[in-house]
Amino acid sequence: VVKLYELSGMQTGSRILTTVAVIAWLPNVMIWAVSWLFGSGFAIGDLASFTMWSGQGSALPGLPAFGILPQAVSTPWIRIALLCIPFVTGLLAGLAVMLFDRGFAVRINKPDQPIDVSRLIAGFAYPAGAFCIASALVAVLSSMLFALSNGALGTKHLAHIGVQVIASTRKVGQPTALGLFSAWLIILVGMAAVFGIRWLIRRVREARGASSEPNTI
């Protein structure tokens, strides 16, 4: 940005006004950054498009505001890590909501306690419903933010700047929902495994007890 100021030969007053304009533009750029960060990207009219795989702004006007736009990420593992952010966030949030006391507090009964089937079903049904609602809210809110961040800087080449709303919403919503329901499935499989192990141990003990009883005639 500073280099663009120097190349454009702006005076102090023009630099201040341009900086204010850049700051006012930051909320939109931050929303575009979410789309870029999760693999969708954004476009500046038909002059340039920016994703983690490619980013070329040489056709853009030499405005300092365009100096804050990102470059492509050349390291593959960094791209993979960034793409996994919504999934990992959803997974950790789902596990926390299901296990913590302030959430649904899903717990396994002690071995000597009887299994309350209705309570067990409710313990998984409520989180499933909550995760469905959360996934829908993420999709709706992200699509609204992406739509509001779009706009125009002109009537020809810069007539449309911003993100593709549907594609960006999908990049945010799908992995987040997948992370939430992966957490639900992990808890379900883990609890089923514990119950299965307990059942096997009980059967082994019963078999040993039956074989150790003396035979009477």
Q: Can you say where each PLM-predicted feature lies in the sequence?
A:
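Aromatic-anchored segments of alpha-helical transmembrane domains
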Residues: A139-L145
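C-terminal substrate/ligand-recognition segments
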Residues: L83-L95, I133-V138
